[in-house]
Amino acid sequence: MSIQKVHAREILDSRGNPTIEVEITTGKGMFRSCVPSGASTGVHEAVELRDGDKKRYGGKGVLKAVENVNTIIGPALLGKNVLNQAELDEMMIKLDGTNNKGKLGANAILGCSMSICRAAAAEKGLPLYKYLAELTGHKEMTMPVPCFNVINGGAHAGNALAMQEFMICPTGATNFHEALRMAAETYQCLKVVIKAKYGQDATNVGDEGGFAPNVSGAREALDLLVEAIAKAGYTGKIEIAMDCAASEFYNEETKKYDLGKKIPADKKDPSLVKDVDGLIAEYVDYGKHYPIASIEDPFAEDDWAAWNKFTVEHGNFQIVGDDLLVTNPARVQMAMDKNACNSVLIKVNQIGTLTETFKTIKMAQEKGWGVMASHRSGETEDTFIADLVVGLNCKQIKTGAPCRSERLCKYNQLMRIEEELGNIPYAGKNWRNSTA
């Protein structure tokens, strides 16, 4: 059960950018984890260490992070017991010594943290999801509702859409296998609808496997989704979730939100620039006309007053904090104190250790918040989050469209888990009630 070897290397993610992979060897074998990275990153996230050498990968290399594992973290882990997850995570945090993992890199630390956990699961002879449940004291497990990002905008696409993700969520399915089939069929129908309206080029896919047709705005994107859902025969069984990533179209100086940020100034309708009340009215109007269940990052990451107003007045929506919370227990506590949202997005690389991730999830579950596990736009073949979402009973996951292998590997792993567990319940309409 003690660590015999730690080795890191630089690999490429799904966007062709470097990322880090860490291997930990024990008497049970070798355990490997790959770390993802995001495109729209919150300013409060832990530091993803990049080399900054413009002559190599445009400055995005991770050789420093690799070296930190191989020369600093690795030697400190040798001989340690992999069953002591919290102790080893704490040791790595202290080894770094900063409050944002800026010295060694959250990417370096997380790769080690995940591989330690995998090694421990093997030590116990358990599948990863069962070990994660045992490690965190979760007695119940539920198959999550998958949220598929099928229309892309914002930082993920070259169209005029300011908001970043439009997702389909099969809450009316009876099990995970059926949910995946419903989404895949709807995705294929969406492709047909988009091709007919915008031409073949509009069916090219973005970083997360979704389409990026040249729509004029959110309503046009939502109309496409409703049409595709109806065409697939799933009206009333598939709901819609949005990730607005509003920090990306917020103007710090004017304190306004520009829904036409990506439209040339001479062609832009001035009414697309909204104050907080105007943007809230926009969201409420979407909710009246479309089956919208969940809205992520509806406001900028430090516009606390707007978050509070929306949550107090319109908490019937699931209001998800991503850039606002960055999977950080301290930020989650602030949001609870300010009543700023009612759900948390979990991205393990935003915080950099599993122990801190577990703490964030526990806080949210004890408060009765929704918990949604998430991929990043720069992904790998690593399936850790699929086991995490089941083991910690999160009930929701978003990991892209049913397209591109780095997305599908997570969904396929969830199908394997459901098959293995047999009669495990599916979250369905109960997806917002995460339980500790």
Curated annotation (Swiss-Prot):
Subcellular location: Cytoplasm; Nucleus
Keyword Secreted: no
The protein's enzyme class: lyase
Substrates-to-products reaction catalysed: (2R)-2-phosphoglycerate = phosphoenolpyruvate + H2O
Cofactor: Mg(2+)
Cysteines engaged in disulfide bonds, as pairs: 147-169
Pathway(s) the chain acts in: Carbohydrate degradation; glycolysis; pyruvate from D-glyceraldehyde 3-phosphate: step 4/5
Entry note: cofactor: Binds 2 Mg(2+) ions per subunit. Required for catalysis and for stabilizing the dimer.
Binding residue positions for Mg(2+) 1: 40
Annotated binding of Mg(2+) 2, by residue: 243, 296, 322
Family in the record: Belongs to the enolase family.
Protein name as catalogued: Enolase 1
Upper lineage: Eukaryota, Amoebozoa, Evosea, Archamoebae, Mastigamoebida
Gene name tied to this protein: ENO
